[in-house]
Design a protein with these regions (language model features):
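N-terminal alpha-helical "arm" segments
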Residues: 1-27
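Sequence/fold signature of self-assembling virion shell proteins
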Residues: 2-10, 142-184, 191-196, 201-304
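Assembly/oligomerization interface modules of large self-assembling protein complexes
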Residues: 25-83
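Solvent-exposed, flexible loop/coil residues
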Residues: 71, 82, 93, 97-98, ...
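A generic local secondary-structure boundary/capping motif
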Residues: 75, 185-187
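Long, contiguous amphipathic alpha-helices that act as assembly "spine/axial" helices in icosahedral shell
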Residues: 75-132, 197, 282-284
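Solvent-exposed alpha-helices and their adjacent loops that cap or buttress functional pockets
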Residues: 79, 189-191
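Glycine-rich, mobile lid/loop segments that gate access to catalytic sites or pores
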Residues: 118-156, 160
Length: 304
């Protein structure tokens, strides 16, 4: 359906002082704070988790050396989606509009819609991967944030707290402790650490106090803020305005191949006129996918 003169009645008459509703600011590329972006040239991408070797064994004098096996464990698949939107304007609406160019106005609105869709899709794994929802799975078939990520040799690896908690000094410290305890597929310590915290806007004031105060917050004790003095979250925090759980928080770790975005086709726009009707059509389109390869790349807590 094309935008016609019946939908733009006031713009066909002189005396209109202002048009408003399409000039809002927008939150730009907040997904870039979470995901590593890579390009793709196929319908989907797959990344395979490998298992190395277990702990080396003591070899007795004259005895044979122990052998171990390495293997593939699970596969993370990124299936690209095509995201697109279009609009059309009648020839008469373009001719009779007395104010700004309709095409310029609505192509800006089209760009806004495409940008918003990307931010919503980007945050989907973080929302749906939380324990109470658990509909977004990592490659091992377990909810993205879980205490039961299975490994080849065990024990399970956790990237959430056993008891969900709101963001405070204790929950943040416990999260950082658990990150430091992460192991690989054979149970070997991997020296993981937190890098950056991602939070909803409701948590920004709490995060500012936790990450910037030199002393402990919420206590009369004259203690230093250990999180700050030890540099436990060196990249600080970022607010993501698309998170819907007001008390959740997430910590990106330095584990490689964690949260990833693949761009199959970057954003392109096109326009064409229809010979029969005279309508002019405008389209925007891109293809991409969001997901996770190694769940150890992020730690998420749902809040109490």
């Amino acid at each position: 359906m094309a935008i016609s003169r019946s939908q733009l009645v006031k713009e066909l008459e002189p005396g209109l002082n202002a048009l408003f509703g399409l000039e809002y600011k927008r939150y730009e590329n907040q997904h870039a704070e979470i995901y590593t972006n890579e390009s793709s040239d196929r319908a989907f991408e797959e990344e395979v988790m490998l298992s190395g070797f277990g702990n080396a064994q003591v070899k007795g004098e004259g005895a044979g050396v122990s052998f171990d096996d390495a293997q593939e464990t699970y596969t993370a698949r990124y299936s690209h989606e095509t995201v697109a939107l279009a609009f059309a304007i009648t020839e008469e609406a373009i001719e009779d509009n007395l104010y700004d160019r309709l095409s310029a106005r609505y192509t800006k609105a089209l760009a806004r819609s495409m940008s918003n869709a990307k931010q919503v899709k980007a945050i989907d794994p973080l929302i749906k991967g939380l324990p109470s929802t658990a509909t977004f799975k990592s490659g091992d078939g377990v909810a993205l944030f879980s205490t039961a990520h299975t490994t080849v040799s065990g024990p399970n690896v956790a990237n959430t707290l056993a008891t969900q908690s709101d963001l405070n000094e204790t929950s943040l410290e416990n999260s950082l402790i658990q990150i430091g305890k992460m192991t690989d597929e054979r149970g070997l310590r991997i020296a993981a650490r937190g890098l950056k915290m991602i939070i909803p806007s409701e948590n920004q004031f709490t995060a500012e106090r936790l990450m910037k105060s030199q002393g402990r917050t919420g206590t009369a004790d004259n203690d230093i803020n250990a999180i700050v003095s030890m540099g436990m979250v060196p990249q600080g925090y970022r607010v993501n305005n698309y998170l819907t759980d007001s008390d959740a928080f997430y910590i990106l770790t330095d584990v490689p191949n964690g949260m990833k975005m693949f761009t199959r086709a970057p954003l392109t726009t096109a326009m064409e006129g229809d010979f029969d009707t005279g309508n002019v059509r405008y389209k925007a389109r891109e293809r991409y996918s969001f997901g996770v390869s190694d769940f150890r790349g992020i730690f998420g807590v749902e809040g109490a």
